[in-house]
Curated annotation (Swiss-Prot):
Its job: Nucleotidase that shows phosphatase activity on nucleoside 5'-monophosphates.
Keyword Endoplasmic reticulum: no
Main localization of the protein described in the UniProt heading: cytoplasm
Family membership noted in the UniProt record: Belongs to the SurE nucleotidase family.
Record's cofactor remark: Binds 1 divalent metal cation per subunit.
Keyword Nucleotide-binding recorded: yes
Protein name: 5'-nucleotidase SurE
Cofactor: a divalent metal cation
Organism expressing this protein natively: Clostridium botulinum (strain Loch Maree / Type A3)
GO cellular component: cytoplasm
UniProtKB keywords: Cytoplasm, Hydrolase, Metal-binding, Nucleotide-binding
EC numbers: 3.1.3.5
Length: 252
């Protein structure tokens, strides 16, 4: 396959480079990623500033470019200027940290994959659980991403769907399997620590904790129970459950 590889952690991040090195052994890979860390960029794009593109050398067989913009910018620029017309799949990751539950609304990783789907290119976001003070093992996540590609044939890929793949932090032997599941509820309870600088300005620093609803059948539940999760996503945010009900409110 011809693969466009991007992320939100930046072009030098361990996750994307681990994945690029493995995928490039079996597929034609072009890496286009932010020059710096752009986590939680969501689906923002650059409008009022020029985007700077730099070619980057990598020690394995990929063509690589850094972009001064956001993760979504990377996909837009790549598909318009940097990659061949016959890209088979956009892959975003491997992200440092899960993108499950409400995380997906903030995620630059997921949004880059969604941007690919908006261009009618099948896309997948790949994220690995991060545990503070423990060393990440991106090789396990890369192996699952490659395995997912090997199970998918080109004719199986829907061009407007994003596959959201998340891998728990544990040994490969501890992983219980793969669960296709829906998005769960994982909310960051935001609090800001307030300080005052020398000029008397308020300085707000983000802190808080995570509130998870552990309902069986969701990505949050299965990650907690050491399953790899796969969730199909779509960029159409219409709430079809109340579409007709809402219409009736304005007809009455």
């Amino acid at each position: 396959m011809n693969i466009l590889l991007t992320n939100d952690d930046g072009i030098e991040a361990e996750g994307i480079n681990t994945l690029a090195e493995l995928l490039s052994k079996y597929h034609n890979v072009t890496m286009v990623a932010p020059e710096n860390q752009r986590s939680a960029s969501s689906h923002s794009i650059t409008i009022y500033e020029p985007i700077i593109v730099k070619q980057v050398k990598k020690p394995y067989n990929v063509e690589a470019y850094s972009i001064s913009g956001t993760p979504a910018d990377c996909v837009r620029v790549a598909l318009d200027k940097l990659v061949p017309d016959n890209i088979d799949m956009v892959i975003s990751g491997i992200n440092k940290g899960l993108n499950i539950g409400n995380d997906i609304l903030y995620s630059g990783t997921v949004s880059a994959a969604i941007e690919g789907a908006m261009y009618k290119v099948p896309s997948m976001a790949v994220s690995a659980q991060f545990i503070k003070n423990k060393k990440e093992n991106y090789k396990i996540a890369a192996k699952y991403a490659l395995g997912m590609l090997n199970r998918l044939k080109k004719e199986d890929l829907k061009n407007d769907v994003v596959l959201n793949l998340n891998i728990p932090f544990c040994s490969e032997e501890e992983i219980k399997g793969i669960k296709v599941c829906k998005v769960g509820n994982k909310i960051f309870n935001t609090r800001f620590l307030e300080e005052i600088d020398k000029e008397g300005n308020k300085i707000l620093k983000l802190e808080g904790d995570i509130n998870e609803d552990i309902y069986e059948g969701t990505d949050v539940y299965y990650i907690r129970n050491k399953y790899v999760t796969l969730t199909p996503l779509h960029y159409d945010l219409t709430n079809f459950n109340i579409l007709e009900e809402t219409e009736q409110l304005f007809l009455s």
